[in-house]
């Protein structure tokens, strides 16, 4: 092969290597961006999906679906009503932990519904919620699971319901928080 042929081959090889490195870096940045955005939900989705590629596609799909939703903050009136409902649920816990935790679950679902999140089923709702509230969604699932679990002694059940109330409170506070406008400079 002539010198010119070797030079052309070297240039083509270099271009291919640079392209492969660029693609790899782009994928790495995309993965890192999803990991940063979704936090623990990223790891949970990878574990559940069985592969990083499948999980990342799922997370990107969630972002796309979320963009097409009309998620709105609560009105001041709705926020006040839900805050009163929440205070009642917390007071109820002393006398009836089971009913209080179920009421807390219902209140959080109501807030999600009023804000425009899908209410088809828990998986659809939590998938949409994970885009805007990736840390709260884990607590929402945990609280929901605690409320709907069975087979515990009365003491264990009360403790599970207490943990559910704590989880729901974190989620509730995040969901009812007024949207803050960015400060103007």
Predicted segments, located by residue:
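Elongated extramembrane "stalk/tether" segments
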Residues: 29-139, 143-153
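Cytosolic-side junction of a single-pass transmembrane alpha-helix
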Residues: 16-30
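Extracytoplasmic/periplasmic C-terminal soluble domains
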Residues: 142-185
């Amino acid at each position: 092969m002539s010198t010119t042929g070797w030079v052309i081959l070297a240039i083509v090889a270099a271009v291919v290597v640079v392209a492969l490195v660029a693609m790899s870096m782009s994928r790495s940045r995309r993965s890192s961006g999803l990991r940063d955005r979704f936090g623990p939900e990223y790891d949970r989705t990878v574990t559940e999906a069985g592969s990083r590629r499948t999980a990342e596609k799922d997370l990107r799909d969630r972002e796309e679906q979320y963009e097409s939703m009309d998620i709105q903050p609560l009105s001041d009136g709705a926020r006040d009503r839900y805050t009163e409902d929440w205070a009642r649920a917390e007071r109820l816990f002393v006398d009836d932990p089971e009913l209080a935790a179920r009421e807390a679950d219902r209140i959080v679902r109501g807030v999600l519904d009023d804000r425009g999140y899908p209410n088809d089923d828990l998986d659809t709702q939590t998938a949409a919620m994970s885009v805007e509230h990736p840390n709260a969604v884990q607590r929402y699932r945990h609280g929901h699971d605690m409320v709907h679990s069975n087979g515990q002694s009365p003491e264990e059940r009360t403790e599970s319901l207490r943990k559910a109330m704590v989880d729901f409170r974190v989620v509730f506070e995040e969901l009812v928080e007024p949207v803050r406008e960015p400060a103007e400079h």
